Swiss-Prot record:
Database matches in SMART domains: DEXDc, HELICc
UniProt effect for mutating Q292A: Wild-type HJ DNA-binding, severely reduced ATPase and DNA unwinding activity, reduced ATP-binding
Region (Wedge domain): 44-171
Protein name (database record): ATP-dependent DNA helicase RecG
C-alpha cells in the first residue's frame, strides 16, 4: 500500500517515475494525483469521414489504415530515426510523427490498421499528431502491440479482434491530462490508476466543521473522483474540494514564512520627539493627509517593537507613499540604524535621491557646511557609477557615515557592507523577488532581522494581496494630497477618427507654446524589439521610429529628446535632466518612465498603440502627469476597433481614475500565472484550480483556517499541501516573482 508522501519510484518503478520527474517535476504520489485532468472523454470517440474537423489542441482518437510511411534521421541525433506515417485520405488525412522511432518502425508499416490517440495540430490546413499513443489492430500474431498505456487497456479487455478492442475504448470513460510528447495522457492515466489501486485511505487534514461550512467532500473521495468518477456532478464536487486544498496549501506556505519571521529579533527604534523624523514633520511645507498620518502611526509602532516589521504599503500614484517611507527611515536613523531603499531602475533611484535630499534639506547634510546639528547623509549606489564612485560610497556605508542609501541591484553585491542596517524599503515590489529582498536584509548585524517596508504604486486586488504578498501586513493610501490636478483621459480610435490623432499632435504643440511639456510613449524601442509582432497584426510604434519621424514632421517645431532602456545611464540621465529643466518640450520614450519620474510641468501624455499595454501599466503611465498646478490630459491612441475586447479595456481605463477598480479588472483579464510571475529558474508559477479572480471566499477562509491551525501545527498533511509552494528545489516560494 502507499501514502501521499511516498516516492513514485517505490510505487511505479524507476522508469515511469523518472519520466514523470523529468517531464513534470513529479516525485511523490501527491504530486501525481494533483496533476489534474484538463478534460474528460466519455468514450474515446473516433474521428470519421463525416465528423467536423477538431480544434487544434483537442484530444482525438483515429482508427484507420496506414497509407504511407517515411523515415528520416533526427537533427540532433543523426543515428536515431524519426518516423512519419499517414493514415486515411482526403479531408481527414492525418500525419503522425514519432521520435526515436527505431523500435516501432517494424510495427507501423504500410497497410497496417492502427489506432492513434493524441492532441491534434494543424500545418497548412492538414491535421497532425506528434508522437501520439498508438495500438496496432488485428496484428498477424494476434497480440496487442503499441504504446504501453493503450496496450494494457487492450490486454485487459481480452477482445479477440481489433474492432472489439476499438469498441472497448469507445465504451469507456477517460480523463485527458496535460501531457508531453514523451509522457502522454494515456501514460499518465495508467500511472494514476496504478497509484490509486494501492493508495491507503487518505486522512482528511481539514476539520469536519470547516468542510461542512463550505460543502466540501472528504479529501480521499475528491482525489479519487477527480481522476476516475464518470459522474460529472461528482467530478465538479471533487474540483471544489481540491480548489480549496490549493488555497489552503498556498496560505499555509505564506503563514509559515510569516511565523518564521515573527520569531526573529528586530531592531527596536522608538520615535524621538527631538529626532530627525520629528524635525522633518515640523519643517514640511504641507500637511500630511489623514491616511498618511494613520499609516505613519502604524509604521512607527512597528519600528519600535522588537520583532521585524513586514509591511506592504500600497497606494495610488501620487498618494504620498515616499514621504511616509522617509519619515519611517528617519525614525530608524534616530536610533542609530541605517536604511536601504531598493529601486528597480537607475532612473527611479536617482529620482528618489533628488526628492529625498530636497525634502530633507539641511537634515541630509551631515558633516557638511550648513547641515543641521544632528543631520544624516543620503547616498546613491548604482551599477553605472564608476569604480571609484562606488568604492567611495561603499566606504561611507561601511563606516556608518550614510544613514540612508538608495540603490538598484548594486546594493545586493557582496562588496556592500553596512555598519548597522536596520530597515529595508523596497520600491515597486513586483520588480523584485523574496530572495532579493532577503539578500539585502542579510547584511544586517548577526542576530538582527531588519524591518521591511515594501511599496507599490500598482494597486493590488485583495486576493492578490492575500496570496502573492500574503506574508506581509498591508496598509493602503487611497486619499490623494491636496493640489493634485485632475487628469482627463480620452481614447483615440485612429481607424475610425484619424483626424483625432492629428488633433493630438496639435494639442501637444499648444501645451508647449504655453510653456508646458509632454510625453509620447511607445510600446517598443525599435524594430528589433518584436515581442508583440504577430502574423497579420500591424507592428506597433517604436520610440526610435517616432523620435525620428516627429522631429522632422508633426512636432518639427518643438524640442524633442529620446529615452528608453537600452540607452547608457549617462544618456538617460542627460535626457531626463534636460526634460526636468525645461530644455526639452517632448520626451519620446518607452515604459522606462512608468514609475518614479516626477516632472510637475508635464501636462500631456500620448500613448501610441495603447492596446499593447496592460490596464495597470496604462494607469501607472498616466500617473506621470497631473503633478503640477495645471490640469492634464492623457490620450490613448489605438488602431483596434472600439468594440473589440482591447478597445473596451482602453475605454475602461479612460472611464475611471480609481486604480483599485482597474486592478480588479486587470486581474480578471489576465491569467493567474501572469499575476504570480515566474520563479528563479524561469518556470511559470501557476495555480491549477484556484482562481484569484473567482475564489476570494476560498482564499479568505483558507487564510483564516491556516492562521488558527498554525498555532498548533500537528497534521503533516497541511505541509504536504503547501509543498509545491515552498519546496526550494522545485517551485521556490510563490511570491519569488
Amino acid at each position: 500500500m502507499a501514502s501521499l508522501s511516498d516516492r513514485l519510484d517505490r510505487v511505479l518503478g524507476a522508469t515511469a517515475a523518472d519520466a514523470l520527474d523529468e517531464q513534470f517535476g513529479m516525485r511523490t504520489v501527491d504530486d501525481l494525483l494533483r496533476h489534474y485532468p484538463r478534460s474528460y472523454v466519455e468514450g474515446a470517440a473516433r474521428v470519421g469521414i463525416g465528423d467536423a474537423r477538431p480544434e487544434a489542441g483537442e484530444h482525438i482518437t483515429i482508427v484507420d489504415v496506414i497509407t504511407d510511411t517515411y523515415s528520416f534521421p533526427m537533427k540532433k541525433k543523426p543515428n536515431r530515426k524519426c518516423l512519419r506515417i499517414t493514415v486515411g485520405g482526403g479531408r481527414n488525412k492525418v500525419t503522425a510523427t514519432f521520435f526515436n522511432a527505431d523500435y516501432i518502425m517494424r510495427d507501423l508499416t504500410k497497410h497496417t490498421k492502427v489506432m492513434l490517440s493524441g492532441e491534434v495540430g494543424y500545418y497548412k490546413g492538414a491535421m497532425q499528431l506528434t508522437h501520439p499513443a498508438f495500438l496496432i489492430l488485428d496484428s498477424p500474431d494476434g497480440k496487442n502491440h503499441g504504446t504501453r498505456s493503450l496496450k494494457s487497456i487492450a490486454d485487459a479487455s481480452k477482445a479477440i479482434s481489433g474492432e472489439l478492442v476499438v469498441e472497448e475504448f469507445e465504451r469507456r470513460f477517460f480523463p485527458i491530462y496535460p501531457a508531453s510528447t514523451k509522457v502522454q495522457s494515456w501514460d499518465i492515466f495508467k500511472c494514476v490508476r496504478q497509484v490509486l489501486d494501492v493508495l491507503d485511505r487518505v486522512d482528511d487534514p481539514l476539520p469536519a466543521e470547516l468542510r461542512a461550512k463550505h460543502g466540501l467532500i472528504p479529501e480521499d473521495e475528491a482525489l479519487r473522483a477527480i481522476h476516475l468518477a464518470e459522474s460529472q456532478s461528482l467530478r465538479e464536487r471533487a474540483r471544489e474540494r481540491l480548489t480549496f486544498d490549493e488555497a489552503v496549501g498556498l496560505q499555509w506556505a505564506l503563514v509559515a514564512r510569516r511565523h518564521g519571521e515573527l520569531s526573529e529579533s528586530g531592531p527596536s527604534a522608538a520615535w524621538k520627539s527631538n529626532g530627525l523624523a520629528a524635525e522633518l514633520l515640523r519643517r514640511l511645507p504641507f500637511e500630511l493627509t489623514a491616511g498618511q498620518r494613520e499609516v505613519l502611526d502604524v509604521l512607527s509602532d512597528g519600528l519600535a517593537a522588537n520583532r521585524p516589521l513586514n509591511r506592504l504599503l500600497q497606494g495610488e500614484v501620487g498618494s504620498g507613499k515616499t514621504i511616509v517611507a522617509v519619515l519611517a527611515m528617519l525614525q530608524m536613523v534616530d536610533a542609530g540604524y541605517q536604511c536601504a531603499l531598493l529601486a528597480p531602475t537607475e532612473v527611479l533611484a536617482a529620482q528618489h535621491l533628488r526628492s529625498i535630499r530636497d525634502v530633507l534639506g539641511p537634515l541630509a547634510m551631515g558633516g557638511q557646511l550648513g547641515g543641521a546639528e544632528n543631520a544624516t547623509r543620503v547616498a546613491l549606489l548604482t551599477g553605472s557609477m564608476t569604480a571609484g564612485q562606488k568604492k567611495q560610497v561603499r566606504a561611507e556605508i561601511a563606516s556608518g557615515q550614510v544613514g540612508i542609501v538608495i540603490g538598484t541591484h548594486a546594493l545586493l553585491q557582496e562588496a556592500v557592507d553596512f555598519h548597522n542596517l536596520g530597515m529595508v524599503v523596497v520600491d515597486e515590489q513586483h520588480r523584485f523577488g523574496v530572495e532579493q529582498r532577503d539578500q539585502l536584509r542579510a547584511k544586517a548585524p548577526a542576530g538582527i532581522t531588519p524591518h521591511l517596508l515594501v511599496m507599490t504604486a500598482t494597486p493590488i486586488p485583495r486576493t492578490v494581496a492575500l496570496t502573492v504578498y500574503g506574508d506581509l501586513e498591508t496598509s493602503t493610501l487611497r486619499e490623494l494630497p491636496l493640489g493634485r490636478q485632475p487628469i482627463a483621459t480620452n481614447v483615440i480610435f485612429v481607424k475610425d477618427k484619424p483626424a483625432w490623432l492629428d488633433r493630438a499632435w496639435r494639442r501637444i504643440i499648444e501645451e508647449a507654446a504655453a510653456g508646458r511639456q509632454a510625453y509620447v510613449v511607445a510600446p517598443r524601442i525599435d524594430e528589433s524589439d518584436d515581442t508583440d509582432v504577430q502574423g497579420g497584426v500591424r507592428p506597433s510604434a517604436t520610440a526610435e521610429g517616432l523620435f525620428s519621424r516627429l522631429r522632422s514632421a508633426e512636432l518639427a517645431e518643438l524640442r524633442l529628446a529620446l529615452m528608453h532602456g537600452r540607452l547608457s545611464a549617462d544618456d538617460k540621465d542627460a535626457a531626463m535632466a534636460a526634460f526636468r529643466a525645461g530644455e526639452v518640450d517632448v520626451l519620446v520614450c518607452t515604459t522606462v518612465i512608468e514609475v518614479g519620474v516626477d516632472v510637475p510641468n508635464a501636462t500631456v501624455m500620448l500613448v501610441m498603440d495603447a492596446d499593447r499595454f496592460g490596464i495597470s501599466q496604462l494607469h501607472q503611465l498616466r500617473g506621470r502627469i497631473g503633478r503640477g498646478e495645471h490640469p492634464s490630459v492623457c490620450l490613448l491612441a489605438s488602431w483596434v476597433p472600439p468594440d473589440t475586447p482591447a478597445g473596451q479595456r482602453l475605454r475602461a481605463v479612460a472611464g475611471t481614475m480609481d486604480g483599485f477598480a482597474l486592478a480588479d479588472l486587470d486581474l480578471k483579464e489576465r491569467k493567474e500565472g501572469d499575476v504570480l510571475g515566474r520563479n528563479q529558474s524561469g518556470k511559470a508559477i501557476t495555480l491549477r484550480l484556484l482562481s484569484l479572480a473567482e475564489h476570494e471566499e476560498y482564499i479568505v477562509a483558507a487564510r483564516d483556517f491556516c492562521i488558527e491551525a498554525y498555532k498548533n501545527p500537528t497534521d503533516p498533511a497541511l505541509a504536504l499541501m503547501a509543498a509545491r509552494f515552498t519546496s526550494t528545489d522545485r517551485i521556490e516560494y510563490l511570491d519569488k516573482s
